[in-house]
Every structure is written in C-alpha cells, then in structure tokens.
C-alpha cells in the first residue's frame, strides 16, 4: 500500500491534508523541523508519525507531498528524486485530489479560515463533507459529497485549483513581498475566477470583487441593497449578532450567530448564499450557524482573573480593525488592550501607517518585536518606527509582561501571525504563579 510522506507536515495546509488522507484510511507520515507548532497536536492525536528531516525518511513505495516552503534542494526531495518516487507540491496534489468531490474553494485576502470552518460545519451537518482549513484542521470521509477547502492567493497558489464553486470574501493588498499592488492581487483573483466550474459567491460590498468577470454565475452578498443576498436589521446582543437575510429583496430567514463584528455577518452571508445555491434547507442553516464554535486562533477566548484574553491571527490592518471592533461589540464596558506582533518586515514597512491607524482604535496598545521571515532582509525598520506613530504605545518583551496586569478588567487582544502565542502563554504563567 502506498504511503504518503509529507515534507513539512507541520504547515497548516499540510497538516490538514495529512489528516484528510489519514481519515480516508491512507497510510500517512511526515517530517519537519523539531520546533513545536500548534498544528502537530491533531497529527499526534491521530497517530500520524512525524520525523525530523533526514534523507533516510524517504523509502521505496512512497508518494511524496512537498510543502511550498521547501525547494528542490531539500535533502528529502533530492532523495525522493534519486529513488524515482512520485513527488508533488501541496497545491498540485490538492488540485488533483479535489476533483473526486463537489469542491468548494474559499478564498479572499481576509476571512478565509473562518468562512471555510463555518461552511464545513454547516454542510457537514447535512451530508458527508470533507474539509481542509487553514488553521491546521482537516477531516476526510471517503463517501463525502462535498470537499470544502481554503485556497490561498499567496504566490498564486490557488491557480492550481479548478473548483466547482468558489467563495471570494474580499480582495485587499497583502503579501507585499510577492504582489506589486492591488491591481496585481486583482489579476490573480480574476484568473482564479475563470477556473471555477459552476458558480462564484462574492462579497458585493467589496469594490474590487465588483469587477470580477467569469464564465459562470457570480452571486453577490453583503449589506448593500444591490446584492443578491443582503443582511438587514442587524442587532447586537450579549449573546451574539442577529440579522435577517433577504434574497433579491424577498425575506429568506432570520439568523443568529454567537459572534461579533460585521466581518462575521459577511462570512455567514457567504455560507448562506452558497448553501442556498445547493438547496440546503434554511432550517439547517439557522440551526448550524447558531452552534458554530469558531476555528483556531480566530478570536479564541479565555478568562483569567478579571481579564479576558483573546488569541487572534490578525496580521493585516483590516483584520486588526475587525478584531478590535468585535471585542468592543462583545465587551462594550471593558477597555480593549491591543498586544500586536507585526509579521514580516516587508508587510510592516508596506502598511506602517495603516497599522498605526488600526491599532489606535484600541484603548491601550503594546507592541512586540517584528516577527521576521527567514527569507527576508530586515533592513533598517524596527518596532520603534511603528511605536512612534501611535501615541501612548508601549513596547513589550516576553521577559517583562507585568504592565498588562494594570488593565484589571481589560480585554487583552494578542494579535499576530508569528509567535505572539508565546507572549500570551508567558503572561498566563505570570498570572497563575
């Protein structure tokens, strides 16, 4: 029996795909660096072997899947080539694999992971559904009708996919180490749109997405009246957000989600529109939207003492604004404290002023050193450049987190795509010892 060997198995997409194949009774193993990542816990729970990188991992009879983070010079890739094994990159393998199912890609500059998780939750309650989420979560079922997966635009990886459906949440300028500008990002999404086989569900409130052309129907959702699916009469309570949905100006249903912020209403609308297209009963939608518990590292809360600690992946100004808005909606009587670790020097430099404006929406701001990519040149940029643009912002080190204790009833938002979690873990240790 063929064994799938994943080179870089701790990557979020790789981890999720390994879990999908394991659930479908394939033999799966992988290798990676020895540093611990949150993505490896589900691998360990499923008994999927994880080895340190070494060429001896490569053996006859394997099919090799390589993370896009590793080049052809990697010792295991070289060994696989020498043995004549089949080798595919993660996007190439996934692009072929999804053809077995009714495939639904979820893409966009922001909101991909949350929307993929929500759609998987709703569809999975109705019929067998496999899914691959960017938080490292994957589930496979051989009899699946649907395969829901997160499709990343970075380096145009999503052009490896030709899905039946595609949800497009928004188009924003990000990944400045690869994309030239917003027009370059749009061109990637436009190319993706031409590869979709049945229909596209897109946010009509997004100015860029309004310009998308395709050979299949484009169904728009949003708050504006000219959308096919529109959210109206939005009410925020202590339990979450209630709204009504109108389909081409006809009342379709009332929905409640246990989440806060306009972005979560939009994510829900995307799922409602896709499920309506697939004739999923409105009763199923209403029931399942109400019970979705969220995905990893997206507004993940815990209470310690009198403080609320929230872990969030927000690493772009748009995402930071959305996270702060959600915190203020849910906890209107508490001060919101932003603890932010910028991710990559290229992104920090490109959006320095936008980061400052987004963070100013918090009541207090703490900044951690920039988390740099191993592939980039630091240059002269430092965290002090961002601090200078935010009045009252403080610098925070992992060894001195005591200032956070001053905000006794605060909502502490630990935000970033690097290793901001180690700051939260260290702070939790301070509070409990």
UniProtKB/Swiss-Prot annotation:
GO cellular component, one term: cytoplasm
Assigned EC number: 6.3.2.8
Residues that hold ATP according to the record: 108-114
Compartments it resides in: Cytoplasm
Catalytic activity: UDP-N-acetyl-alpha-D-muramate + L-alanine + ATP = UDP-N-acetyl-alpha-D-muramoyl-L-alanine + ADP + phosphate + H(+)
Sample GO molecular function, one term: ATP binding
Keyword set includes Iron: no
Natural source organism: Halalkalibacterium halodurans (strain ATCC BAA-125 / DSM 18197 / FERM 7344 / JCM 9153 / C-125) (Bacillus halodurans)
Broadest EC class assigned to this enzyme: ligase
Function: Cell wall formation.
Annotated protein name in UniProt: UDP-N-acetylmuramate--L-alanine ligase
InterPro entries according to UniProt: Mur-like_cat_sf, Mur_ligase_C, Mur_ligase_C_dom_sf, Mur_ligase_cen, Mur_ligase_N, MurCDEF_pg_biosynth, UDP-N-AcMur_Ala_ligase_MurC
Keywords from the named record: ATP-binding, Cell cycle, Cell division, Cell shape, Cell wall biogenesis/degradation, Cytoplasm, Ligase, Nucleotide-binding, Peptidoglycan synthesis
GO biological process: cell division; cell wall organization; peptidoglycan biosynthetic process; regulation of cell shape
Annotated Gene3D superfamilies: Mur ligase, C-terminal domain (3.90.190.20), Mur-like, catalytic domain (3.40.1190.10), NAD(P)-binding Rossmann-like Domain (3.40.50.720)
Statement: the UniProt record of this protein carries the keyword Oxidoreductase: no
Organism lineage string: Bacteria, Bacillati, Bacillota, Bacilli, Bacillales
Pathway: Cell wall biogenesis; peptidoglycan biosynthesis
